Amino acid sequence: SRDQYDTVVVDAFGSGGSVPYQLTTDEFVAALHARLDARGVVAVNLASAIEGERGLLAQAMVATYKKHFEQVTLFQLDPGVDPAMAQSLMLVALRGSGAPSFASADPELRHYLARRWKGAVPEQDVLTDDFAPVDYFFNKAVF
């Protein structure tokens, strides 16, 4: 089908805890982007640091999503964790040209929006079907 979606959640882990590489590549993200409506949102659950060598997975995934989406943001599920340490993250990618508002009158929503990573994410190569060292990056993050 050629259905369009407003929201897609990618929450898949292979054996050992890593995201299957097929769900991280430029080709997958391009196909995902094509199936979202004009204001669509993708949320990706991943385990990685943000900074340093342990952050290679998150850095590469941010680079890959930025190739296709106007807005890409990371959220720390526990903002008290050192950004150089492995942690649970949510990558959120938005279609549309307008900058998102991370303000809300709802106190519970404000609590979650406050977990947005406001620092820079180091540059990394885009992941492709021919170059996706996801397991290597994941192992660097957690071991």
Residue ranges and their predicted role:
Residues 16-24:
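Glycine/threonine-rich flexible loop motifs
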Residues 1-9:
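A short acidic, Gly/Pro-enriched loop at the edge of an enzyme's catalytic core
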Residues 29, 55-74:
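Conserved Class I S-adenosyl-L-methionine
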Residues 71-143:
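Soluble small-group transferase modules, centered on the S-adenosyl donor enzyme superfamily
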Residues 24-38:
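A short glycine-rich, Lys/Arg-flanked "PGG" loop and its adjoining helix->strand segment in the class I
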Residues 12-13:
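Conserved NAD(P)H cofactor-binding loop of Rossmann-fold oxidoreductase domains
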Residues 39-46:
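Conserved beta-strand signature within the Rossmann-like core of class I S-adenosyl-L-methionine
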Residues 46-58:
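Conserved class I S-adenosyl-L-methionine
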